Design a protein with these regions (language model features):
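Surface-exposed extracellular loop regions of Gram-negative outer-membrane beta-barrel proteins
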Residues: 368, 413, 458, 478-533, ...
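Gram-negative outer-membrane beta-barrel transporters
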Residues: 442, 554-556, 575-664
């Protein structure tokens, strides 16, 4: 009997093995017919079966363990006709099949279910916004030019500190805690000094994933958020481009094939080039003179170029480079400029007989900044370095295995004088090595997405294990519960204090060695900044046109490094009896952020509406006292509307209204004469003219007035010859001219406001 059972078990195992062996795999890429660009997030399936997949950002799809036979593979996505191909799958073989989708030329008569809504059922998708150029352009085009940073300001949990020199604070994290990737390359400062524009040209973007909390182990080195930006490959069919000009800026975009495909078995090469230039510092002297007697002293220039070589199988390699410049020149007050440049390559490799997709990148980037003020010593900061990585993605029907390795090396060089006139210098070289593993498993209605990252920081000899987890449960076809969390660490810190309200100077430095040995009575064992995230949420598709998303989150920043504003002594043996809080250049703090974000979206034919409400609480703890950081905004509301008119949908009206409760502010308590003993005891204080010092009140215990602003734009498209159109845009920033307080000059008691009403006009020609 026992022998029979053994034979029976062996036979069953053999049968299962043979059954698995008698299956096939189909994989490939989906492309757009009009320009040869990959089509991301399209639904691909075998007609009449349950086998289905979604294309990734490269247009890649894969389906495995398919019984041999004849099938029709189909691809669908919003705005395109369904593409299909008949295939015959053979056991133990792999079919590579390319699909080409044609754009619809007729007005939508009914609402189509987008692939984005379908992917919500198979991906955790918590605390992440996928942003497309079409969505960016549905907002008012401020300065007659839509921009990613304008869209970022309406993303749930994101707070902008101002129109001039403003930065983005994402669910309690500071800008240095937000990792920005452009085609896999690290960008250290993605936003220009005037807070309406980023360094990215909207027309070259393919997709931007904004992770606001709880992101997976494929991302490391930051403790708050990630912006992963992917650009287009360039038109593979014909030479085309766009030329635009307005009252704020002008730009030129050119793209086209370097080598066209002779047939479907031939490879291609293409390019895309964007040049963007702002002349607001010149036009504002006449058009916006009411905003400032000297005009608005902001100017910038951005250049980005990319060359892509594609094989017939879908494998590709890309080479890219950029140069970004930004300048601010307040006459007789301050001069500020920064520059960023870099280049690199990335590739996607699809081995013919393998189910694995291999991706890799290698890039170098540099960022330097300098601020010269009339009454202060100059400050400067430099960070440059490389990053490289390889990751492997393995598809098992709806399951995925993703693993990889990343190496980053960078140098920081920093010079700064704090409020106590103490000089702070640091020059460091550091290397970070990270490996990660991620496995996504779908079990009926449950999606499990665990991952782990192991990160080594060579300059401080610290090792950081970072487990993370994402979960989703499909309660029904239209209601889903989700959660995510994990541990995070980073080395890079900002070269300015979290307490600074207005600071154009935004530099970087790596984790310093001279941290205090204790915090809040406990010994400090690590030099890294550390955080823990937890996010829970619910998605509800009310109907085909209307859905709601609610997320609650916690970020526990259990160790932060900040510049010490109270540093008045050198950390030498002569000052051994002084506490670390007055002699260390840097201090340790803790932070805690919690909040709830509610998003309602409505999309039906010509109308798009979006309501975002954010409730947030952020605190910092120095060990001696607790305070609210300057970006702590209790309530933030954004209402967005977009409507298309005309038979050809050639008119569009866009509007956005933003309300924010007041930011924390520290008030003055008085003034005193400050004597600078430059020569020590030999200083003749009777001949030394003192400087005016400020006695500050309790840190950030008061609040600025509430902020609100309405922006509107109107667009008209004139269809010219084939593939050519002229678009005219009129926009108004701050329609009702609300005087929103930016900051108060402590010495002169002058109130400096955000941008006033600013109408603009622009036109663009696409060809």
């Amino acid at each position: 009997m026992t022998i029979k059972r053994i034979f029976l078990a062996a036979f069953c195992m053999l049968a299962v093995s043979l059954a698995n062996a008698q299956t096939a795999t189909i994989k490939g890429f989906v492309y757009a017919a009009e320009n040869g660009e990959p089509v991301p997030f399209a639904s691909v399936f075998l007609k009449g079966t349950t086998f289905a997949s979604f294309t990734d950002i490269n247009g890649y799809y894969s389906m495995v363990k398919i019984p041999p036979g004849k099938y029709r593979v189909m691809a669908t996505t919003l705005g395109y006709d369904t593409a299909f191909a008949d295939v015959e799958l053979v056991a133990d073989e792999m079919e590579n099949r390319k699909l080409v989708m044609k754009k619809k030329n007729v007005e939508l008569k009914q609402v189509e279910v987008s692939a984005e809504r379908q992917t919500k059922k198979t991906e955790v998708k918590i605390a992440v916004e996928s942003v497309t150029p079409q969505e960016i352009k549905s907002l008012p085009s401020l300065g007659a030019e839509g921009d990613l940073v304008q869209y970022m300001q309406v993303v749930p949990g994101v707070v902008s500190s101002g129109d001039q020199g403003g930065q983005l604070y994402i669910r309690g994290g500071t800008p240095v805690q937000n990792k920005v990737l452009l085609d896999g390359m690290v960008i250290y400062n993605p936003f220009h000094s005037i807070g309406l524009f980023s360094v990215f040209d909207t027309d070259i973007l393919k997709n931007t994933d904004v992770y606001t909390a709880g992101f997976g182990a494929q991302y490391g080195g930051r403790i708050s958020s990630v912006m992963d930006i992917t650009t287009r490959d360039g038109n593979k069919k014909r030479i085309g481009g766009k030329v635009s000009a307005g009252t704020f800026l002008s730009k030129v975009l050119l793209e086209g094939p370097i080598k066209k495909a002779k047939d479907e078995n031939d490879g291609t090469a293409s390019f895309i080039l964007s040049v963007k230039n702002s002349y607001l510092d010149q036009t504002s002297k006449s058009i916006y003179k009411y905003a400032s007697d000297d005009g608005l002293p902001y100017s910038f220039n951005d250049i980005y170029g990319k060359v892509v070589i594609n094989s017939a199988s879908g494998s590709k390699v890309s080479f890219f480079g950029f140069n970004f410049l930004d300048k601010v020149n307040y006459s007789k007050v301050a001069k500020y400029d920064w520059s960023s440049s870099g280049g690199g390559m990335n590739f996607v490799l699809v081995p013919g007989a393998s189910k694995v997709l291999l991706r890799g990148n290698l890039a170098f980037s540099s960022y330097k900044i300098k601020l010269t003020e009339a009454e202060e010593k100059p400050r400067s900061s430099l960070v440059n370095g490389f990053n490289m990585g390889f990751n492997w993605l393995y598809f098992l029907n709806n399951d995925e295995i993703n693993y990889g390795i990343e190496v980053q090396g960078f140098k920081t060089d920093f010079e700064y004088f704090n409020y106590a006139k103490r000089q702070i210098n640091q020059t460091e070289n550091t290397t970070e090595i990270g490996i990660f593993f991620r496995y996504k498993k779908i079990i009926n209605k449950l999606i499990i997405d665990p991952s782990v990252r192991l990160q080594y920081y060579a300059s401080i000899s610290e090792f950081s294990p970072e487990p993370r987890l994402g979960l989703k449960y499909n309660l029904s076809d239209n209601i889903r519960l989700k959660a995510a969390g994990g541990l995070y660490a980073q080395n890079l810190i900002a070269a300015n204090s979290d307490r600074d309200v207005v600071n154009f100077f935004y530099g970087f430095l790596s984790a310093p060695d001279d941290l205090p040995s204790e915090f809040d009575g406990k010994s400090v064992k690590k030099k890294l900044q550390l955080a823990r995230h937890a996010v829970v949420g619910v998605e509800y598709d009310i109907n085909k046109y209307f859905d709601i998303n609610i997320e609650g989150y916690i970020k526990d920043f259990n160790q932060l490094t900040n510049i010490n504003l109270d540093n008045v002594y050198y950390d030498t043996a002569n000052n051994f009896d002084n506490p670390d809080s007055v002699k260390k250049s840097f201090i340790i703090e803790k932070g805690f952020t919690q909040g709830v974000d509610v998003v309602l979206k409505y999309e039906y034919r010509r109308m798009y509406a979006w309501l975002v409400y954010s409730l947030g609480f952020s605190t910092r703890n120095t060990g001696n006292y607790e305070y609210a950081p300057h970006f702590d905004r209790r309530h933030n509301i954004n209402i967005i509307g977009s409507y298309k008119l005309g038979k050809k949908l050639d008119w569009e009206v866009d509007a956005r209204w933003n309300f924010g409760s007041g930011f924390p502010v520290t008030l003055n308590q008085g003034f005193y004469p400050y004597l600078n003993f430059q020569d020590g005891l030999a200083t003749d204080y009777t001949q030394n003219n003192g400087e005016m010092g400020v006695l500050y009140g309790p840190l950030n215990e008061s609040r600025l007035p509430t902020y609100h602003r309405l922006d509107i734009s109107i667009k008209k498209i004139f269809y010219l010859v084939r593939n050519s159109e002229l678009e005219v845009v009129a926009s108004v920033v701050n329609v009702y001219n609300r005087k929103n307080v930016f900051y108060v000059d402590r010495i002169r008691h002058n109130v400096v406001n955000q941008l006033p009403i600013m109408p603009s006009l622009g036109a663009s020609l696409t060809f």
